[in-house]
């Protein structure tokens, strides 16, 4: 498939680009500034609807792996519609997952204040997707999310934060990339958020 990728030069986006390429997909990175990513890059601002639509036109899907505080969901949805891109897959955050009935991680005691702007922006991004008619998927990682190994093993959940037997909620960037490309190839969560953890 032809996949446009916002954030191809980032920590998660780089792993997504590698996973997509290894599985035979044609990847075009979209960024405001040219970057060395190992994939074809197109310069376009994700907050410029016309420029983004031009950059992603002809793609089978758009993947988004950028910071929510620097992106506008409505603009991205508009560009996807204008360009006729059939699918939108977004790397989300864990902040909007529920840790108890009626309590999201963002509102739980102990949420570091420095994370609140990004977590709040991610929650609003998801809410904008949920109100749209687009074919979107939002993947929320585990609470502990960082570089690691590609094990190929992960559990799939819904709106609740998953923990292992030790009470940990973890996933690697590499396994998140595998999970999102798995979803691209075999869609199971159209117009839904899903979560993953070990």
PLM region spans:
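C-terminal substrate-binding/catalytic lobe of Rossmann-fold NAD(P)-dependent oxidoreductases
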Residues: 116, 131-198
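A generic structural motif
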Residues: 23-27, 134-135
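Conserved beta-strand positions in the Rossmann-like core of class I SAM-dependent methyltransferases
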Residues: 4, 28, 137
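Glycine-/Pro-rich loop/turn segments that contact NAD(P) or position catalytic residues
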Residues: 68-154
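Conserved glycine-rich Rossmann-like NAD(P)H-binding loop of the short-chain dehydrogenase/reductase
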Residues: 26-34
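NAD(P)H-binding glycine-rich loop region in Rossmannoid oxidoreductase-like domains
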Residues: 35-83
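N-terminal Rossmann NAD(P)H-binding glycine-rich loop of SDR-like oxidoreductase domains
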Residues: 3-23
């Amino acid at each position: 498939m032809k996949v446009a990728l916002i954030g191809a030069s980032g920590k998660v986006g780089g792993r997504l680009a590698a996973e997509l390429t290894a599985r035979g997909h044609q990847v075009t990175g979209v960024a405001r500034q040219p970057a060395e990513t190992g994939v074809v890059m197109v310069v376009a601002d994700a907050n410029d609807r016309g420029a983004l639509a031009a950059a992603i036109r002809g793609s089978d899907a758009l993947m988004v792996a950028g910071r929510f505080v620097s992106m506008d969901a409505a603009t991205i949805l508009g560009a996807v519609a204008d360009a006729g891109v059939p699918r939108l897959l977004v790397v989300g955050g864990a902040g909007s997952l529920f840790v108890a009935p009626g309590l999201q991680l963002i509102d739980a005691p102990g949420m570091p204040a420095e994370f609140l702007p990004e977590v709040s922006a991610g929650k609003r991004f998801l809410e904008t997707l949920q109100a749209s008619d687009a074919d979107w998927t939002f993947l929320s990682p585990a609470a502990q999310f960082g570089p690691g190994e590609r094990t190929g093993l992960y559990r799939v959940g819904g709106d609740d934060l998953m923990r292992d037997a030790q009470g940990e909620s973890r996933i690697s960037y590499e396994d998140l990339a595998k999970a999102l490309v798995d979803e691209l190839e075999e869609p199971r969560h159209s117009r839904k958020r899903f979560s993953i953890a070990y």
